[in-house]
């Protein structure tokens, strides 16, 4: 393990205070040093032992998060921004020099460093499964090595939050789910990009105003208990809020007494609005504490009795997919859900186990890729070698996902011929699909070609629409929250043969 400490001179506070705001913004966008130290020490090793090898790295994950049977891929737009701006600034070079572990020649090389390779990726919002490459980097080895940490950091975080959100939205059974987690997120970036991922996976809005501005997504919110407490009484607080926001009048009713004060006062305000001819276009109550199942049913009775049958009954308070499912099963009349902590932190499953592994090295003489494999005592950690792509297989009549198949680039398939699938771990398991019973779609798209971005990132709300379409291709059994049916990710025969040839080779060596 290398342990180093910078001898860099501390910035003068007055200098920092006089820097232009834009300079900070530009510096924040250059994330080239958002990497683990060993990426840079390996790069210097490649530089000192000249290697311009073209390699293939795959970013993938091994196990579905949150006990589910799928994940929702997210974060590609931020990966693109990172790669586009990949360069070492003079400040970066100065800092690396201060560590006293990098040679001057190598640091000089870094001054002109930029990405020149190819990247293929599965589009955001796509439902994905273990072991299939979410991002594939084909580039000179130093470039491909450097981008590992940032790619995993971005994809792991946003895919985790998107997957967790998808489960919460599924539990809500068509009710609106709002992302309310900014104040509980692990820092500003986690709040902003976590909210972005939540919108991709189906939230109807976020409380995060900066996220709304950055990604053009709906922002939503009501008021806090402090609003009520700042007035002489609850009724005055409600009346004032209703005058300000008559077309979005959701009143928080649990500051003092939900059933004996909050809801009766809310109903009184709604009656006054109705009497004054104010259209009740979007109105209702929110509860943030107590027995939400019981309180919501009582609230529904009280609202219906006064003719407010279309009032929104919204709930918050440490919600997640398990609690929402329980409330639904108890007959709760809640039809709008504000989910914060457990969504933005993915509290019960706080990590997405994405990894980044070398899969092939190009033979300079032939231009063909030489497959590479990582072995392990744990068979699930044995990698799939070669330059690969992934196809999704659907039932021709059902249009539902049957399986995914990982294959070598260049393989062709004919949907009018039988298709033989090989389990990557249980080698005795094979599946034969009859001709004419399935359709196939290649998942990855090219994002960078020779260092230039060739992909247009869709808007977040367009990604959300695509994600909903993706989720509709899954059987209900795959989307259930407990003990779901898993979709198989199989190997083609050529890839299966390649993998087992390498296993045999290294076994006997």
Which ranges hold each PLM region?
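An N-terminal, globular interaction/scaffold subdomain
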Residues: 81-85, 121-124, 128
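Short coil/turn segments at secondary-structure boundaries
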Residues: 94-95, 163-167, 181, 479-486
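N-terminal, Lys/Arg-enriched amphipathic/low-complexity engagement segments
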Residues: 55-111
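Buried, small/hydrophobic-residue-enriched core segments of structured protein domains
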Residues: 15, 19-54, 63-65, 101-102, ...
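Gly/Ser/Thr/Ala-enriched C-terminal appendages of enzymes
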Residues: 20-53, 66-68, 304-306, 311, ...
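Short, positively charged and aromatic/hydrophobic N-terminal segments
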Residues: 2, 10-18
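Structural motif
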Residues: 176-179, 218-221, 248-251, 283-284, ...
């Amino acid at each position: 393990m290398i342990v180093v400490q910078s001898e860099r001179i501390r910035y003068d506070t007055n200098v920092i205070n006089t820097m232009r705001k834009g300079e900070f913004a530009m510096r924040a966008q250059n994330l080239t040093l958002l990497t683990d130290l060993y990426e840079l020490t390996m790069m210097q090793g490649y530089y000192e032992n000249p290697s311009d090898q073209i390699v293939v790295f795959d970013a993938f994950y091994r196990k579905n998060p949150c006990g589910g049977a799928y994940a929702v891929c997210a974060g590609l737009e931020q990966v693109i921004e990172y790669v586009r701006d990949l360069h070492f600034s003079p400040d970066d070079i100065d800092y690396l020099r201060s560590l006293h572990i990098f040679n001057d020649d190598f640091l000089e090389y870094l001054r002109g460093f930029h990405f020149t390779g190819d990247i293929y990726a599965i589009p955001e919002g796509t439902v994905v499964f273990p072991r299939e490459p979410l991002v594939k980097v084909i580039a000179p080895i130093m470039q491909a090595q450097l981008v590992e940490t940032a790619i995993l950091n971005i994809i792991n975080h946003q895919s985790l939050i998107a997957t967790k959100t998808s489960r919460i939205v599924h539990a809500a059974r068509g009710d609106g789910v709002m992302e309310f987690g900014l104040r509980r997120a692990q820092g500003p970036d986690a709040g902003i990009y976590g909210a972005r991922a939540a919108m991709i996976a189906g939230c109807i809005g976020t409380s995060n105003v900066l996220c709304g501005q950055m990604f053009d997504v709906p922002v939503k919110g009501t008021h806090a208990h402090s609003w009520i407490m700042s007035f002489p009484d609850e009724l005055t607080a409600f009346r004032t809020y209703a005058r300000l926001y008559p077309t979005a009048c959701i009143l928080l009713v649990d500051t003092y007494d939900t059933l004996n004060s909050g809801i009766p006062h809310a109903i009184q305000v709604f009656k006054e609005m109705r009497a004054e001819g104010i259209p009740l276009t979007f109105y209702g109550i929110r509860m943030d504490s107590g027995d939400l199942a019981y309180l919501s049913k009582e609230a529904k009775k009280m609202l219906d009795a006064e003719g407010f049958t279309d009032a929104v009954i919204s709930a918050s308070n440490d919600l997640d997919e398990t609690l929402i499912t329980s409330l639904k099963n108890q007959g709760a009349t809640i039809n709008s859900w504000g989910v914060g902590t457990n969504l933005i932190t993915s509290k019960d499953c706080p990590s997405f186990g994405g990894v980044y592994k070398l899969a092939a090295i190009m033979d300079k003489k032939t231009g063909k890729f030489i497959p590479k494999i990582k072995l392990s005592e744990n068979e699930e950690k044995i990698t799939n070698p070669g330059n690969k792509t992934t196809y999704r297989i659907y039932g021709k009549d059902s249009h539902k996902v049957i399986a995914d198949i990982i294959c070598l680039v260049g393989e062709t398939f004919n949907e009018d011929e039988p298709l033989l699938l090989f389990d990557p771990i249980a080698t005795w398991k094979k599946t034969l699909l009859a001709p004419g019973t399935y359709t196939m779609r290649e998942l990855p798209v090219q994002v960078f070609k020779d260092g230039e971005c060739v992909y247009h990132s869709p808007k977040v709300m367009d990604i959300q629409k695509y994600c909903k379409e993706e989720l509709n291709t899954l059987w209900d059994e795959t989307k259930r929250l407990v003990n779901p049916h898993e979709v198989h990710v199989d190997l083609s025969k050529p890839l299966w043969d390649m993998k087992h040839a390498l296993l045999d080779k290294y076994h006997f060596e």
